[in-house]
Amino acid sequence: MASVINTNDSALLAQNNLTKSKGILGSAIERLSSGLRINSAKDDAAGQAIANRFTANVKGLTQAARNANDGISIAQTTEGALNEINNNLQRIRELTVQSENGSNSKSDLDSIQKEVTQRLEEIDRISTQTQFNGIKVLNGDVTEMKIQVGANDNETIGIKLGKINSEKLNLKEFSVVEKEAVAAKPAVPAQPAVPADPKNGVAAKPAVPAQPEVKAQEAVKKTDNPLDTLDKALAQVDDMRSSLGAVQNRLESTVNNLNNTVNNLSAARSRIEDADYAVEVSNMSRGQILQQAGTSVLAQANQVPQTVLSLLR
């Protein structure tokens, strides 16, 4: 090797290796501080792209699981309302069986019909007012609610909904009594009593009380086969309840599957982008040793040109 002053090959080589060891140490420190093996595309371009797709899927499936839980809540809310409708129908059927007994007076039947009417109005109220997050689920506005249960397009589960009220159940004109039509009559004012007048041959007349106005009433026809009609209504409610129960079970299974998929994808992503601390601590120690050794060697390499001066003495 020639003895030169302008170019110190040994120092340049030591400096180059020192720069490399500095990069190793810096990379190890970055990974240890972030917990990630891939902090930018330069670390692993293909791995970074794969991990990014996994992240998109994990976030989408996590939200899909929340959507499915919302779907379960919708089905539970609707089924709870149908359960109350069922209770009212059961009571109406009980009253109808009671009304079929021949020992009931007209007054008894009227009392039974009043409760039947109130129960039917309650069914209509439940149908009109039952809602989830502002969406009415039993008034017919929504026939099917789609729940997004996947991270991609068209991955949905439909919840069948429908209108359930007295009209839909064929109970709009349901009656356990039969009434004839009544014509309207105007109110009649009271007439004062007329005292007797023997001189003029006028007999006394008692006071006539006022007669209230009689409003017209249409004839009410008793429902034919009322118990069969109610059984069909109950079957209609049961059919919708069973459908909601089935979709609840399906959504619960969907949530479990989504959670398993999220766990597996998260584990796969971790294997790609997360830092192995045992490896990185080893790399950091190696980088530190190389830095210390490189610095020491560079200092010695810088002394090599000094030996040329001895030739000038």
From Swiss-Prot:
Bias-annotated ranges (Low complexity): 190-199
Extent of the Sequence repeats: 179-197, 199-217, 255-259, 262-266
Annotated GO MF terms: structural molecule activity
Region (2 X 19 AA approximate tandem repeats): 179-217
Subcellular location, record wording: Secreted; Bacterial flagellum
Region (Disordered): 190-211
Ranges for region 2 X 5 AA approximate repeats of V-N-N-L-N: 255-266
GO cellular component term of the entry, any: extracellular region
Residue ranges of coiled coil: 5-33, 97-117, 252-298
Pfam families: Flagellin_C (PF00700), Flagellin_N (PF00669)
Protein family membership: Belongs to the bacterial flagellin family.
Function recorded in the entry: Flagellin is the subunit protein which polymerizes to form the filaments of bacterial flagella.
Record protein name field: Flagellin
Organism: Xenorhabdus nematophila
Gene designation: fliC
